[in-house]
Curated annotation (Swiss-Prot):
HAMAP family: AnhMurNAc_kinase. CDD domains: ASKHA_NBD_ANMK. This is Anhydro-N-acetylmuramic acid kinase. GO terms for biological process: 1,6-anhydro-N-acetyl-beta-muramic acid catabolic process; amino sugar metabolic process; peptidoglycan turnover. GO terms for molecular function: ATP binding; kinase activity; phosphotransferase activity, alcohol group as acceptor. Catalyzes the specific phosphorylation of 1,6-anhydro-N-acetylmuramic acid (anhMurNAc) with the simultaneous cleavage of the 1,6-anhydro ring, generating MurNAc-6-P. Is required for the utilization of anhMurNAc either imported from the medium or derived from its own cell wall murein, and thus plays a role in cell wall recycling. NCBIfam families: PRK09585.2-1, PRK09585.3-2.
Length: 382
């Protein structure tokens, strides 16, 4: 089957689309990436998403309209990846669309029950591409008592499980998440959870203090020094002390967190602030390994992916934090994969599993009571 996986993440840097060929289903699936592209959001759409994400500035009319606008954006992104690959849209069998997360409430709080909302209307995508769309992957896991995240572990087992080595996969998107993949000969469980901020705080600080979308290759962070006072403040965030499985998002590490941090520590240079929040991402990742993984799993390889793996300063900070551990650190490209395409490929794989009616959540990662088939199916017009 030919499937387009569509991902718009918490970094808001655009729409990632992976055109993938998948043979079979389940753990024996054979997956080949045909083409990958990122379609940037226009400024107006990005501004509307940012407004929709804000509790103070959002409104139901905006979210209603944006749901359909993003459906068109996702449909156009699928057309673009097919065009770039010289692949006929009529040959496409499925689209797996994650959607744009507007709010994620992984656990009950006050009178709010556990819930999640991703938008990007699948009916619009299906109609505009004349292709079956599978979307809304997180909700069934939450209905089964899970946190709806992380969802990529299932695809990571298919793609990365090694016959003899335990591997640890770290995604560094807007949020960081880790998956422990035991070797094929191991009887240990796959576990996965969010490690805290990935690029989210780094990008927000970069935009506010340097008027740049992100710190390219970590060049600015390389120039500054870590401020221990700020790092201690960040590392005391209650999310870090929670036991897995756990998930987080912009609600905890987004604009409000950055606003409070910058107000509290405005006396420090902007370079030192950026260096310190970069170290916070690295330190939160290393902390979770040492606290929740390395005492229980003998890890041979750590594989870094996502946009953060291109931040050389961040990667070196992670390497330094793990210098005394017996594991080798790679980025996706070192082993023949793409850091950028990883999550989009994951949602193509999840769409394939849903099409075959196979459960594809990992209860040991999400906390769900049982394995369930994920996603809603939207058929095109006849």
């Amino acid at each position: 089957m030919y499937i387009a996986g569509v991902m718009s993440g918490t970094s808001l840097d655009g729409i990632d689309v992976a055109l993938v060929r998948i043979e079979g289903s389940g753990v024996d699936s054979k997956v080949k990436l045909i083409h990958f592209t990122t379609v940037p959001f226009c400024n107006d759409i990005k501004s509307e998403i940012q407004q929709a994400l804000s509790i103070e500035n959002s409104n139901v009319q905006l979210i209603c309209s944006l749901n359909f606008k993003l459906g068109l954006c996702f449909a156009n992104a699928v057309k673009e990846v097919c065009k770039e690959a010289n692949f006929s849209l009529e040959q496409l069998d499925l689209i797996g669309s994650h959607g744009q997360t507007i709010y994620h409430q992984p656990k009950p709080e006050g009178n709010m029950i556990a819930s999640t909302l991703q938008i990007g209307e699948p009916a619009v995508i299906a109609y505009d591409t004349n292709t079956t769309v599978i979307s809304n992957f997180r909700t069934m896991d939450m209905a089964a008592g899970g946190q709806g995240a992380p969802l990529v572990p299932y695809s990571e087992v298919i793609l990365y499980r090694d016959p003899s080595k335990n591997r640890l996969l770290q995604n560094i998107g807007g949020i960081g998440n880790v998956t422990v993949i035991p070797s094929q000969k191991s009887d240990q469980n796959v576990i996965a959870f969010d490690t805290g901020p990935g690029n989210m705080i780094i990008d927000e600080v970069c935009q506010r203090l340097f008027q740049l979308p992100y710190d390219q290759n970590g060049e600015i962070a390389e120039q500054g020094e870590v401020v221990d006072e700020i790092l201690t403040y960040c590392m005391n965030h209650p999310f870090l002390k929670m036991n897995p499985p756990k998930s987080t998002g912009r609600e905890q590490f987004g604009e409000e967190f950055v606003s409070q941090l910058l107000k509290r520590y405005e006396k420090y240079s902007k370079e030192n602030i950026l260096t310190t929040v970069t170290m916070f991402t690295a330190s939160s990742i290393v902390y979770h390994y040492k606290e929740f993984i390395l005492p229980y799993y003998e890890i041979a390889e750590v594989i870094l992916g996502g946009g953060g793996s291109y931040n050389d300063t961040l990667v070196e900070m992670i390497r330094y934090g793990l210098k005394d551990e017996k594991c080798t650190i790679f980025i996706q490209e070192d082993i023949g994969y793409s850091s950028e395409a990883k999550e989009a490929i994951a949602f193509a794989i999840l769409a394939n599993e849903t099409y075959h009616r196979n459960p594809s959540n990992v209860p040991s990662a999400t906390g769900a009571k049982k394995s369930v088939v994920l996603g809603n199916v939207t058929y095109p017009s006849i």
